[in-house]
Amino acid sequence: MLSWLWNWWMWSGDNDNDAIAAEDRFNADDYKKYHINAQQWSHIVKWDSFKCNTHSFKYRYVHSDTNAKCYNVIDFCKGLEIAHDDILDCNWDGDQVYHLNEIVFHKQRSKRDLNSLGALFATKHGLLEILMRLNFANKSNALLHIQTEGERDDLRDKIESVLKHVKKLNANSEKFMVTHETFKNEVGNRFEQFELRLHELDAKLNMLQSAEKLKTAVVAESKNGTVTFPRDITKHQHLAVFSERIDDRIKLAFVLGQERHFRKRKMRFEDDMEVLYDGVHPNPLLAIQCINEKLYDKHYKIRKIAKRVIDVDCTPNVVREVIQEVL
């Protein structure tokens, strides 16, 4: 990351005349011949928006088997208003650049030609390598925005602020002390955020340890005999797990309770979500805790939406596997 920032900063001082000339030579019609059958690949090729201070456009992307995001290179060349003739000299055979067929059908790499450029997708690193060699307006802002995609805007602002301070130190040494003090305050604020995050992680670890102790006690107790349910079946505890896919994430909802209340609560989710589990369970709360724990152990990010409703960064198959393993 630091190496990339250094290269970006060194480049930002280059001559901007080439970028202005490239912008004057840009013609959007030159890119019309590159297209993908959007209807045929609509279940694989997705759309997203790129927005920074100087550029705004839509681009296509796909996810590889490793869930890495790959960007359509031609969409970025067109959106950044790069002259078409300039991209003809690019090296499209890099190990971070893939044809759509290589991602979908796992075909062997083949020689790139002009007819296949519209179906080329690159990882973030591969896209940055290509764009670094091309001239276009406001290049530094665009590259920084691509590199920091998905991160919080305040982090990007802090990085830009640090780079501005470094340039000021090189240009005017008399302002060194003022700039140094500002930089020190920003670093101090960052460490405060780290400390807060550590406290949050410590609280989560304590919660997981408590859950582990509870699970161990229940498992030990279950070895001494079977679970006995009340003769009155209306007193039995029920558990239902619902799922819904939202973009690349999974929304999970848990419903529990005795039969009368349980039926009413299920009605909130039955019409819109898929049922993964629905039955009598001796301890629904413990089951929910075990499901969360399994997802944490597999390093999937979990975000709480509402009471007993969570958002998980994983695939439907992963959720089904965890539900089957726990329940």
Swiss-Prot record:
Family annotation (InterPro entries): DUF3627
Protein name: Uncharacterized 38.7 kDa protein in PK1-LEF1 intergenic region
